Structures are given as C-alpha cells and as structure tokens.
Amino acid sequence: MPFIANTDDDRRSMLQAIGVGSFEELIPDIPSEFCLKEALSLFPSMSEMEVASLLDRLASANRTSPDYVSFIGGGAYDHYIPAALKTIVSRSEFYTAYTPYQAEVSQGTLQAIYEYQSMICRLYGMSVANASLYDGATAMAEAVSMAMNVTGRSTVLVAGKIHPNTSAVLKTFIEAGGKASVVQNVLTDGVCDIAALESRMSDQIAAVIVQQPNFYGCLEDVEAIGALARSHGALFIVSADPVSLGLLNAPGRYGADIAVGEGQPLGSALNFGGPYLGIFAVAEKYVRKIPGRLVGMTKDRDGEDGFILTLQTREQHIRREKATSNICTNQALNALQAVVYLSLMGKDGLCQVAEHCLQKAHYLADKIADLPGYSLRFAGPFFREFVVNTPVDASVVVNTMMEKGFFAGYDLGIHDDSGLLIAVTEKRSRAEMDSFVENLGAIS
C-alpha cells in the first residue's frame, strides 16, 4: 500500500476537530531549540537498487564480533549459537515477536512458550516463570515493583554491584514515579559488604537485590544476603546469569523469592543491543502477583492437552489501577530462541559451556596479571569476566587493541569507574587468548 502524506487541508481539519490551533500546541513540553526550524537535509530520491547499495556502504563501517576476537561482556556475551537454532526459529509458524491474541489457534507457539517457562523454572529452581519480559533490566524493575506491591514498603536495597544500566532503569521505573527509593550498599573487594548491608536493613525494606555473578563478574555471598532479607521480611530478588547456572546454585535453592535475568546468552545474537530477553520467575506463593503473560496447560472438551493464556491480571484485561503490571507483552521470538538453545545444548551441554567460560576466564586472567603494569582489581572468585587495572587509560587499551583485531573489553570509564572489564566465553581459543595477551603486553 503506498504512503500518501497528509495535505495541509488534512492537517487543518484534524487540528480543528481536536480544538487545537497548530501542531506546536501539541508539543509544549519540547523546548523550541530542539524543534526543527527548516526541513531535514535528506538524501535525494533513490531507486531500490541505489538504496540497497547505500545501506551496504553504511553497514560496512560497522565493526562486529564476527570481524574481531571479542572479549566484551558487561551484560551481552559472544556465545556460540548452534546452526540448527536459526533454522528452527525461522519457520514461518514461529516467526513472530508477539504472543498470539487468538490463543486457541496458536497451540504450537503457546506450547513453545510453555516449554520455555518450564525450562526456566528448572534452570532457576523456581516454581513459576512468565513468558518473558523485554530484557533483563525491565525484568529487574518489574521485580522491584512486584516486591513493593507485595510488602507495601517503599525502599529497595541493592546488595552488590548490579549493571549500571539496570540501575538507571530501576531509577526510571521506581524513583521517577516518586513511589520508592533505591539504595546502593557498600562494596568491599568488588562484592557486597555483608556487615554494611546488615546495618542498612530495616522493616522498611521492600526487597534486597543481588546480581549473581555481579557486574564485575565477582561471585556474591548470596546465602548471607538472602538470610538478611528474610530476617527483615523483605523479598529476596536475584538477577542470575543463565549460563552461570550450569555451574552455580540456582536462585530457588538459596531462597530467592523472585529470580530474573538477561536471557541474551541463551541463543540471542548481540544485535547492537537487542532485542533481548527478560527472564522472570517467582516462588509459587507469588503466582498471582507475577507480571507479564503466563501460558498454562489444560484439557479441551475432547480431553486432549491444550495450552492457554492464564491468570491474565494485566491492564488489557482488568482495570489499570488493579493490574499487577502494565507490561502486557513478551519477547516471544527470543523466548523461542532460548528454549531451542537449551533443548539443543541439553543439561550437560550447558554445564560444559559454563565450565569452558570459567576455565578460560581464569586462564586469561592469570596471563594478564603476569604482564607488567596490569593487575586484577579484585581478589575473589569470578565467573566468565573480571576487571583488570591497566597501565594506561582503559579507553586507550580498547582503541589500540581494536587496531590489532580485538574487542579488548568493556571500558568501565563509561560509568565513571576505572579498569577494563574482560569477558571470556567458550568461543575463545587458547591461541586467541595468547595473542591477546601478547598484544596487551605491548601497551604501556
């Protein structure tokens, strides 16, 4: 269908219908200096062939992980994605990012989501998982909102170092609305200071949040943190990396009330930041408080198994003010990628991926620590990524190593921090890591 722009008469008619004199009256909150005063300088009209050629040239300026040896982490990881995954998720029956509204005629999609929920429950050790949320940060914000609704309290305590972007989303969701405050606890050697956390606990704390492994890759004392949360009636929220659960204890095993996570490592490509996958699971007693969509199994009138959307306490179905959340969709395609990834890898395969990440990260960390001018910032145990003190500013290291064919890591200076956050996945070979160390050693 062709696009036909509105004419001046069309615009005047619409403005008159809503009782407005000009378009500018509709956007008074936008400062005038940010409004266009003249037409945009756009490309001249092009044919389809010319547009394709232009886009190819623009795209060629990008530098992506297949072109470099990547050690970037910080929430998005260069894991191997099995070839069969793309073939399966590209089937036309599955290829949608949305949960079907006509659930009765979309049994295949609903079953895939049901299997995803079941696998997430097993992986995280929880009783109920939803059909996914937008990403890990959104899942964390929804977990905090749920905790406040459950407890009636208004303060959230961050026990360790969570991703700064997640922290920003929390502030937008929670603090911007004037509903609550988010308090960051003190860190010692990169992890939560348990004594400081205990001193901050009170009966006004709605939830205690911990990321495991934390943003720095360090492993937190989740048992002690969870015990403190429970002793004050606060909900215990754990943001756990799904790949790490191939080796680490599941959040449900150490008493998490809500478990969330970023599902990107489970078969989703890096994709310049998205779309990703928000994992969200809860203990059984909170099943009616969980946000997002839930797929359940039932029997049809013929006694056959069937799948439905159930417990739909969202704003589409009930009054907005009574909804558990205004999140009313999910990342169906990414959830499908996750369930296909987990199915292809199997329990043993996921454990092997986690083991490779752990061993290779420690191999590289030991090699880098031996270089003059370099040192590990933290002494405690870590999984897959670690922070390195560098002899020059981390941004210099990143730019120099890029010229050598490496994505050297995540410059923590972006977040007013220091050091280089380096991640190692199962894809990295010994030869790549040795070459990386050799090139790092030339920077001083």
From Swiss-Prot:
Record EC number: 1.4.4.2
GO BP term, example: nucleoside metabolic process
Pfam families per the UniProt record, alphabetical: GDC-P
InterPro entries: GcvPA, GDC-P_N, GDC_P, PyrdxlP-dep_Trfase, PyrdxlP-dep_Trfase_major, PyrdxlP-dep_Trfase_small
UniProt protein name: Probable glycine dehydrogenase (decarboxylating) subunit 1
Protein's job: The glycine cleavage system catalyzes the degradation of glycine. The P protein binds the alpha-amino group of glycine through its pyridoxal phosphate cofactor; CO(2) is released and the remaining methylamine moiety is then transferred to the lipoamide cofactor of the H protein.
Main enzyme class: oxidoreductase
Family: Belongs to the GcvP family. N-terminal subunit subfamily.
Record-level Gene Ontology MF annotations: glycine dehydrogenase (decarboxylating) activity
Organism: Prosthecochloris aestuarii (strain DSM 271 / SK 413)
Alphabetic keyword roster: Oxidoreductase
Subunit architecture: The glycine cleavage system is composed of four proteins: P, T, L and H. In this organism, the P 'protein' is a heterodimer of two subunits.
Catalytic activity: N(6)-[(R)-lipoyl]-L-lysyl-[glycine-cleavage complex H protein] + glycine + H(+) = N(6)-[(R)-S(8)-aminomethyldihydrolipoyl]-L-lysyl-[glycine-cleavage complex H protein] + CO2
